[in-house]
Amino acid sequence: MYSMRVVIEETDVTIRADSKESVSSAAKAVKLHRSELDRYVAKDPAFVTAKVPVRTLEGAPEVAKLMSRAAEPFGVGPMAAVAGAIAELAARASEPTVIVDNGGDVQVRARRSVVVGLYVSDDHPLSGRIGFEIEGVLGVCTSSGKFGHSYSAGKADAVTVFAERASLADAAATAICNLTSGDDPEAAVQRALEFADDFTGDLIEAAVVIRGDFVGISGRPPKIVSLRGGRIKPARLEPTI
């Protein structure tokens, strides 16, 4: 596969695709949508700080509208979907097979089977040891109360969500992770799963919630595979092709 890394301030995207043209198309889309979002939030600063759903202003760019729509059903602010939305739009601009990894929030469009590995935290026994086998179109996004740059009110080691669109997976992961606070890890995982159950089979396909020794699954995630060849580097979710 061909690959390229695009870094624009907080946006750190790795693109992998079967052709140079697909990589180039995705990279151009990342730059375009990041630039349009920067210009938009300069006019609508409340869009960045909102912790609840907000509507976009008239004339908002596609990326801002996508973020707003994705966040609304989960009751979170639009920035909860920013990484997934940019990954989704970049992958949409390319021909399969393409994998766009925006800081661990991943959009896959694959004509063949690919594996996305799970990163939890450096000291967690599952981290880098398992992956998910994916074919077709799928977004895979993770939120954590332990690592990463994104805001989370939860204490989960990782909440990984699978949805056809990465924008939805990203917003859902944030919302589910926010419910994993409290001193009782088992109760926190159960509470998060009950929330996820309201969306699985509809807006999302599955969610995996990990806090300490407690792991719970809502819905039907992709096939889980063992990564025996070594650990992946810390990037939340990392394409292992």
UniProtKB/Swiss-Prot annotation:
UniProt cross-references to Gene3D superfamilies, sorted A to Z: ApbE-like domains (3.10.520.10)
Disulfide pattern: none
InterPro entries listed in its UniProt record: ApbE-like_sf, MA1715-like, UPF0280
Protein family: Belongs to the UPF0280 family.
NCBIfam families: PRK04334.1-1
Protein name as catalogued: UPF0280 protein MK0206
Organism: Methanopyrus kandleri (strain AV19 / DSM 6324 / JCM 9639 / NBRC 100938)
